[in-house]
Amino acid sequence: AFDQALQLRADAPGQYQGESPKPYWNMVGPFGGVTAATLLQAVLQHPDRLGDPLALTVNYGGGLVAGSFQIQAVPVRTNRSTQHWTLSILQAGPDGAPVVTTTGTAVTALRRETWSVGDAPAPQVPKPADLPAIPPAFEVEWLRRYEMRPVTGVIPQVWDGSGDHSLSQLWMRAAPPRALDFCSLAAMADIFFPRVWLRRARRTSRRH
């Protein structure tokens, strides 16, 4: 399902057409992680790409609706080792005119021999097999696309304002299992539930 969700048709260099993926539907539009992964996929498919993804920032202006969309991926600056991108997703609005739903930036870079160091050690947590997988919460499709085994930071069981932290720690993988790559990592980076849900543990009511 994930690879199908990322399928894009190139109309011209940097111009791609895609379809909103129903298997990754959220409460409003697709799961934001798969939207981010689709933007990155456009960069990876661009014939002028230099190097591999180094950074990705996505700004969600509005939810995608069901149907087709267009991605514009533009390499705005290419240096000797790095390349900088601007990204946007457009869909037809109520009047048929294109409307920007999502924007983003990305940086790709050539891999060179250098040094590396890890300043933040991995947290000491139980092994995945020692933690139960949580069933999908809410009636949204995208939660069925992942297996999650939380250590801490699950959705509050009681919404009484008793939240005291916003830390989420969990093991996760695609369901069914799929090898990790740049796009799947970009999608998984958005899996965590909203911080405010954990910190406040309080529902809000809408006024009509």
Predicted regions and their residues:
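Terminal targeting signals and extreme-terminal segments of soluble enzymes
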Residues: 1-208
